[in-house]
Design a protein with these regions (language model features):
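Class I (Rossmann-like) S-adenosyl-L-methionine-dependent methyltransferase catalytic domain
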Residues: 1-58, 64-75, 79-111, 134, ...
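Short loop/turn motifs at secondary-structure junctions
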Residues: 53, 74, 99-100, 118, ...
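A short acidic, Gly/Pro-enriched loop at the edge of an enzyme's catalytic core
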Residues: 112-122
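A short SAM/SAH-binding and catalytic strip from SAM-dependent methyltransferases
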Residues: 121-135
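A short glycine-rich, Lys/Arg-flanked "PGG" loop and its adjoining helix->strand segment in the class I
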Residues: 138-150
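Short, compositionally biased P/S/T/A/G/V-rich stretches that sit at domain boundaries
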Residues: 220-243, 328-348
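Immunoglobulin-like IPT/TIG beta-sandwich domains and homologous Ig-like subdomains
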Residues: 238-318, 346-426
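Short beta-strand edge segments in extracellular beta-sheet folds
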Residues: 322-328, 423-427
Length: 427
C-alpha cells in the first residue's frame, strides 16, 4: 500500500488524488476540491457555528492536503493521516502556512496515534475505494467510531458498486454494501443520518456517535401521533409536488417540522401508498425549522394522489400527507460526455488515444456500438456507475486507422442512433 502510493505521489500526486488531469497547477488542483468541500460543509450545518468554535477534525487519507487546507478554517485543529510518506511530505509543504493543520504518517490500517473521543468531526473521501482489504476498511470504521467524541459526526465515502470478480489492488479496492453500513452503525450505537448513492462508486454516509446502549433505547420509544408534521412533499430533484412511479426521478423530499432529534435511518419509515420507500438522508434543521427527509420511492403500481405516512418504526409520527404520482416518461438514451480517457477535462480532445464515454438511460449496455471516422470500434469496457439513471461508463481505444485530426464519433444503441460528436485527435 505505502509503496504504491509513494510511487503515485512521485509520478503525479495531483492526478492520482483528483483523477482527471495530469500536471495540474496548484490552483487547478485545489479547485477540484470545491464540490467535496461543499458536501462536507453542508454536514457542519447540523450544529450551529458557535457550538463548533472549539471543534477538532480528522481527515482519513489526506493525501497532499487538498481538502485539509480549505476545511481548516472551520476547526481549532485539523489532523490528517495518510499511508504515504511522500504524500505527507507534500501535505506539510502545502500546509506550512496553516498552523492548525497537522498531517501524520500512519500505518494504513488504524488511527492508533489518537486516543479515543478525540475528534468532533471525521471525514474521508476517495480513500476507502482504494483499499483492497475489506478487513482494513472495517478496521477504519471501528477506529472512526473510537476516535469520535460522543455526539460527534462522521462523513465518509465508500465505493458502493457491486463486487467484481477481479483481483483487488491499491487502485481498484474493495466494495462496501449498504447492509454493511447499516449493520455496523446499529451494532455500534451510531445514529445513521445519511446513506446516499447506493450502488455507486460515491456512496456517502453520515454518522453521529451516540452513547453505549442508545440503539436499544430507540427500539422501545413511542411518540404521540402528530409529534411531527410534514409541511410539504416535493420531487427530490425539483420543487414540483409530484414524482414518477419509477425511474431516475422517482425520489421525494419530505419537509418535516419537529422531527425527533434521535431520528435516523434505522428507525424512520416513509410509506407511500402501500409500499415503503427507502429513506436515504435526514438533513440539518434549516432556518425555517424544517428538516429535509430524502426518500427513494419503491416501484409503484398506482398513480394519482397517494398517502404519505411518516413513522417511527411502526408508530405514526405525523398526520398523513399526499403525493401526486405520475406515470414515468419514456426512456431516452443520452450520450452525456466524451473525454480523453486519462485527461478527463480535455473534453472532446483525445490526447492518449483512450476514449471515455458516459451514457445514461441505457437498459442494454452491450447493444452500444461505436465508430470513429467510419471505422468500427473494437473492444469496449462497460461499467455501470449508477443504476438509478442507468448510467454507464464505456471505455475504448481508437482504431489504429485513425490518425491525428478531426473525426466523427457515431454511437448507436440497438437500432437507435445518437447524435454524432466531433473528436479532435492529437496523436
Amino acid at each position: 500500500m505505502r509503496d504504491d502510493w509513494n510511487a503515485r505521489a512521485r509520478e503525479d500526486a495531483g492526478y492520482y488524488v483528483a483523477f482527471g488531469r495530469r500536471q495540474q497547477s496548484d490552483v487547478d488542483f485545489l479547485a477540484t476540491a470545491t464540490d467535496v468541500i461543499n458536501i462536507l460543509e453542508s454536514e457542519l450545518r447540523r450544529v450551529p457555528a458557535p457550538q463548533r468554535s472549539m471543534w477538532k477534525a480528522l481527515e482519513i487519507g489526506c493525501g497532499p492536503g487538498r481538502l485539509m487546507r480549505p476545511m481548516s478554517r472551520h476547526f481549532t485543529e485539523i489532523h490528517g493521516v495518510d499511508v504515504s510518506d511522500e504524500m505527507i511530505a507534500l501535505a506539510r509543504e502545502r500546509l506550512r502556512d496553516t498552523p492548525n493543520a497537522h498531517p501524520h504518517l500512519t500505518d494504513g490500517a488504524s488511527l492508533a496515534e489518537f486516543p479515543g473521543e478525540t475528534f468532533d468531526f471525521v471525514y474521508s473521501y476517495a480513500v476507502f475505494q482504494h483499499v483492497p482489504s475489506r478487513e482494513v476498511i472495517a478496521a477504519y470504521m471501528r477506529e472512526t467510531h473510537r476516535v469520535l467524541k460522543t455526539g460527534g459526526f462522521a462523513r465518509l465515502q465508500f465505493n458502493g458498486m457491486p463486487a467484481r470478480d477481479t483481483s483487488l489492488d491499491t487502485w481498484s479496492g474493495a466494495r462496501t454494501t449498504t447492509s454493511e453500513i447499516v449493520e455496523f452503525t446499529q451494532l455500534h450505537d451510531i445514529q445513521l443520518l445519511a446513506l446516499e448513492g447506493a450502488g455507486t462508486q460515491y456512496m456517502w454516509t453520515t454518522w453521529r456517535k451516540q452513547p453505549q446502549g442508545w440503539q436499544a433505547q430507540q427500539e422501545d420509544r413511542q411518540f404521540p401521533a402528530g409529534t411531527s408534521r410534514i409541511r410539504r412533499v416535493t420531487n427530490a430533484q425539483s420543487s414540483e409536488p409530484g414524482a414518477p412511479s419509477r425511474g431516475r426521478y422517482a425520489s421525494i423530499s419530505l419537509w418535516v417540522e419537529n422531527l425527533p432529534a434521535d431520528a435516523g435511518l434505522h428507525h424512520l419509515r416513509v410509506q407511500v401508498g402501500d409500499s415503503l420507500g427507502t429513506v436515504t438522508s435526514i438533513g440539518p434543521i434549516m432556518k425555517d425549522g424544517l428538516q429535509q427527509v430524502s426518500v427513494v420511492l419503491p416501484e409503484l403500481e398506482a398513480t394519482g394522489l397517494l398517502p404519505v405516512e411518516l413513522r417511527w418504526l411502526e408508530g405514526p409520527l405525523a398526520p398523513l400527507a399526499t403525493l401526486r404520482v405520475i406515470p414515468p416518461g419514456p426512456s431516452v438514451p443520452c450520450l452525456c460526455s466524451v473525454t480523453d480517457g486519462t485527461n478527463l477535462v480535455a473534453d472532446k480532445r483525445i490526447e492518449t488515444r483512450h476514449v471515455k464515454m458516459i451514457l445514461e438511460e441505457v437498459a442494454h449496455p452491450h447493444e452500444i456500438e461505436a465508430s470513429v471516422g467510419g471505422v468500427p470500434v473494437g473492444d469496449r469496457e462497460f461499467l455501470c456507475t449508477d443504476p438509478k439513471p442507468q448510467r454507464f461508463e464505456v471505455d475504448f481505444r481508437l482504431p489504429e486507422e485513425i490518425g491525428p485530426g478531426r473525426h466523427e464519433l457515431q454511437v448507436s444503441i440497438g437500432r437507435r442512433k445518437l447524435a454524432p460528436v466531433m473528436l479532435e485527435v492529437t496523436s
